[in-house]
Amino acid sequence: MGQKINPLGFRLGTTQSHHSLWFTQPKNYSEGLQEDQKIRDFIKNYVQKNLKISSGVEGIARIEIHKRIDLIQVIIYMGFPKLLIENRPGGIEKLQMNLQKEFNCVNRKLNITITRIAKPYGSPNILAEFIAGQLKNRVSFRKAMKKAIELTEQADTKGIQVQISGRIDGKEIARVEWIREGRVPLQTIRAKIDYCSYTVRTIYGVLGIKIWIFLDGE
């Protein structure tokens, strides 16, 4: 039987790079990893609480963390940074202050920068948030998937595959539905594929969304 592998981990060092860059002693490794996860969760929760977005899309594609002895550099890649910058004057400073307070960074300076993504809907995380918002509003899953594919076509992608699993449309038996447009060569390591898996809570239960986007290159 074929074993499924995470497309991002499979391509690390070729088309994918690490989202955390730091070194530490082996015994402190787990602490550093937990700290990274807490920082990412804190930022996502802060954005969720402070932004009342009509579309339900936070627009965070990924969060990179670079650590040095005296500095933690956090880079937030967003599709719609205006939501955080324009709607709330001093939004980044407040987030930085809250994060520093939360993690008690006494000896280390914390620096947060926001980078805008040129094509937001070419990112699977932003696309998954969009589909999740549609499903929560009880839009038909097929309609939501087709709309997502239309949005990626604007981002000049070469192929996309969307999969939704769970009690779709409130049916009693859980099932898996998927749709593919263009090419998605999962076996080719040189192919630049972006992937995300996302969980959405609906009134019928939890649904899982998986998205593979073939960007370019082979």
Curated annotation (Swiss-Prot):
The keyword Ribonucleoprotein applies. PROSITE patterns: KH_TYPE_2, RIBOSOMAL_S3. GO terms for cellular component: chloroplast; cytosolic small ribosomal subunit. GO terms for biological process: translation. It is found in: Plastid, Chloroplast. Keywords: Chloroplast, Plastid, Ribonucleoprotein, Ribosomal protein, RNA-binding, rRNA-binding. InterPro entries: KH_dom-like_a/b, KH_dom_type_2, KH_sf_prok-type, Ribosomal_S3_C_sf, Ribosomal_uS3_bac-typ, Ribosomal_uS3_C, Ribosomal_uS3_CS. Residues 47-118 form the KH type-2 domain. Gene3D superfamilies: 3.30.300.20, Ribosomal protein S3, C-terminal domain. Pfam families: Ribosomal_S3_C. Its main location: plastid. GO terms for molecular function: rRNA binding; structural constituent of ribosome. Belongs to the universal ribosomal protein uS3 family. PANTHER family: 30S/40S RIBOSOMAL PROTEIN S3, SMALL RIBOSOMAL SUBUNIT PROTEIN US3C. Part of the 30S ribosomal subunit. This is Small ribosomal subunit protein uS3c. The lineage of its organism: Eukaryota, Viridiplantae, Streptophyta, Embryophyta, Tracheophyta.
